[in-house]
Amino acid sequence: MSRRGTAEEKTAKSDPIYRNRLVNMLVNRILKHGKKSLAYQIIYRAMKKIQQKTETNPLSVLRQAIRGVTPDIAVKARRVGGSTHQVPIEIGSTQGKALAIRWLLGASRKRPGRNMAFKLSSELVDAAKGSGDAIRKKEETHRMAEANRAFAHFR
């Protein structure tokens, strides 16, 4: 048994312009090779594009998109007696948000388009409306969990 104390849970910091934790989580996920200023640039340009497209507050569009993509349940591979089962597990809010952000960024990277800011803004607007690749990913995850409900007792 470890003698070390339990690690303190870190509180998410908020970004300098919007003073929002979700924006900061998005910046930290989009970050590549430690170029945080570039990540901030991409996010803020995407927010401006959302403002121009929808003529509403880009933060509310971001919140709506993340809320729409956040999964309630996921599947986890569990080895039981020589065979691997996909066991459905419930997801907490923080982990769900992290998954949603990862899916949104993955879907926007796959999109055809000029630059990342344009692709991200399009994906966020689509997700807020209830369409797009990230929403499809969430629905697919929920379908997988529903199909493997029989293995829920393996938790």
From Swiss-Prot:
InterPro entries: Ribosomal_uS7, Ribosomal_uS7_bac/org-type, Ribosomal_uS7_CS, Ribosomal_uS7_dom, Ribosomal_uS7_dom_sf. One of its GO terms (biological process) is translation. The keyword DNA repair does not apply. One of its GO terms (molecular function) is structural constituent of ribosome. Keywords: Chloroplast, Plastid, Ribonucleoprotein, Ribosomal protein, RNA-binding, rRNA-binding. It is found in: Plastid, Chloroplast. It holds the Pfam family Ribosomal_S7. GO terms for cellular component: chloroplast; small ribosomal subunit. One of the primary rRNA binding proteins, it binds directly to 16S rRNA where it nucleates assembly of the head domain of the 30S subunit. PANTHER family: RIBOSOMAL PROTEIN S7 (PTHR11205). Part of the 30S ribosomal subunit. Belongs to the universal ribosomal protein uS7 family. This is Small ribosomal subunit protein uS7cz/uS7cy. The lineage of its organism: Eukaryota, Viridiplantae, Streptophyta, Embryophyta, Tracheophyta. The gene is rps7-A.
